[in-house]
Amino acid sequence: MEVLLRRLASADAARCLSTSLVGSISDKCIRAGPSCRTRFPFRFGSLCSFSDSSNESNACSVSSENEAAVNCNGFRTWRNGGGTFHHSACIDPTALIETGAVVHSNSVVGASVRIGSGSVIGDAVTIGQSTRIGYNVALSNCTVGDFCVIHNGVCIGQDGFGFFVDEHGTMKKKPQMLNVKIGTNVEIGSNTCIDRGSWRDTVIGNSTKIDNLVQIGHNVIIGDCCMLCGQVGIAGSVTIGDYVTLGGRVAIRDHVSIGSKVRLAALSCVTKDIKEPGDYGGFPAIPISAWRRQIAKLSQSSRKK
């Protein structure tokens, strides 16, 4: 009888230990993503079979029918905010993913990141620590640095605008296979669009600030500490140096290079390279003193008439 009692006590202890262990491992795997499955190569569903029925919901988060169905598609509910994430994503426990936001497979979300409702984080996107992402943001094919602010409605990493006409006169799309790289401490205003690259990555430098409704084409490289005001349009394959300021509605044609410490007046249009630092304006953009003289002469001639 004593032997039987000892065996029963040992079985109860083992069952309690397995329940505690399963709960701990499943909790870590939810947060750690693919690296955890390398150390623990088993399915979440199999964990539930080890736990006692009374503690099943605590030991494994896929115990209910609804959550199990979600897990069949690879998506689960993030406990901090109620958003949805793919089981292969790696998300820091301090990140907040609001209800209605989705983080897709193999993405990495850093510490203290906040993702607003309606935002979609595509496959293999990386978001650095303490970055704030607003509502209805779409990120794909990109990496975002630390301490960035991305306002509502921003789209980053979509196809660039590249087409060609084949021998039959049919318009065909050029492949846009590369990425967008956003530096640290970057702020991007509402409804701005940044296209991914085709032959080189699109790059936004550290501490650059971008206003609302800005279009940045594929293969564009923007340096550090630049300021882009509202409705700026930058065509593909443009290179911009550091500490450049673009006034409202500035337009820059494709394959143009602009040196560091250049400032462009509002409504300017850049049609050729600008190598020297200074202030520029007009269409086409020229040194601002020359542009002002042109405006003065035009005003005088119109008065004489």
Question: Where are these predicted regions, by residue range?
Answer:
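Terminal amphipathic alpha-helical/low-complexity segments used for targeting or macromolecular assembly
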Residues: 1-88, 93-94, 147, 153-176, ...
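Structural signal for interior beta-strand "rungs" in well-ordered beta-sheet cores
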Residues: 83-287
